[in-house]
Regions:
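Broad phosphate/nucleotide-binding scaffolds in NTP-utilizing and phosphate-metabolizing enzymes
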Residues: 1-179
Length: 179
C-alpha cells in the first residue's frame, strides 16, 4: 500500500521523472482491488460494533491504498463510509522501513541534490502516510477545511462524528466529480 502511495506522491515530481514515467505513476490512483470479504468483516466489526446501519453496501465504490469507500444508510441518510484497510498501520510501518533501507542502500549512487531531495520526500511521505492511516486525522482535516471555507461555494461532506473512529470516517454522501 505504501509503495503505491509513494508512487502517487512521486507522480507529482517532474524533477525526478520524465513525463512518460509520471503518466504511468499517475495511473496508480485508486487501482487497488478491494479488501477480501474476511478482511472487510474484521474491519467493519472493529469500526462499528453495536452500530446498526439500515443498509451497508459491501461492494466499495472506490478502493485505494489506505482504505475503501462504501455507501451506507443510517437514519434515512445516504452516507459515504471510508474504511481503512485491514492491518494497514503495521503494513505502512514495515513499508517505511523497507523504503528507508533502499534509500540508504542506493544513496551513494545519487547526486548531492537528488540525495537530499529524495531524503526529504521520504521523510515527509513517512509522516504523511502515518497520519493518513488514522481516519481520526481525516475527520479532523475535514472539520478544519469545512470551518475555514464555509462560504467558498465548495460542498464539504458532513461527518457523523459519533460513528467515526481511527478505523472509519462516516460522512454525508456528496455527488461530485474527480479532478
Amino acid at each position: 500500500a505504501s509503495f503505491i502511495k509513494l508512487a502517487q506522491v512521486l507522480a507529482t515530481r517532474a524533477d525526478f521523472f520524465t513525463l512518460d514515467y509520471l503518466e504511468e505513476l499517475k495511473s496508480l490512483h485508486d487501482k487497488l482491488p478491494p479488501m477480501s470479504h474476511e478482511e472487510f468483516e474484521r474491519v467493519y466489526a472493529e469500526a462499528f460494533h453495536g452500530v446498526n446501519f439500515e443498509q451497508f453496501k459491501q461492494e466499495p465504490i472506490a478502493s485505494a491504498s489506505i482504505g475503501q469507500v462504501h455507501v451506507a444508510y443510517f437514519e434515512g441518510q445516504k452516507l459515504a463510509v471510508k474504511l481503512r484497510r485491514y492491518n494497514i498501520q503495521a503494513q505502512v510501518k514495515a513499508d517505511i522501513a523497507i523504503i528507508s533501507f533502499f534509500n540508504r542502500l542506493f544513496r551513494p549512487l545519487f547526486s548531492h541534490y537528488t540525495k537530499n531531495s529524495i531524503e526529504a520526500v521520504i521523510i515527509e511521505f513517512s509522516k504523511m502516510i502515518l497520519q493518513e492511516v488514522n481516519m481520526s486525522t481525516e475527520l479532523h482535516n475535514l472539520q478544519k477545511f469545512s470551518s475555514i471555507y464555509p462560504t467558498s461555494g465548495i460542498k464539504f461532506p458532513t461527518p457523523l462524528v459519533g460513528l467515526c473512529s481511527e478505523h472509519a470516517l462516516v460522512m454525508s454522501f456528496e455527488e461530485g466529480f474527480r479532478f
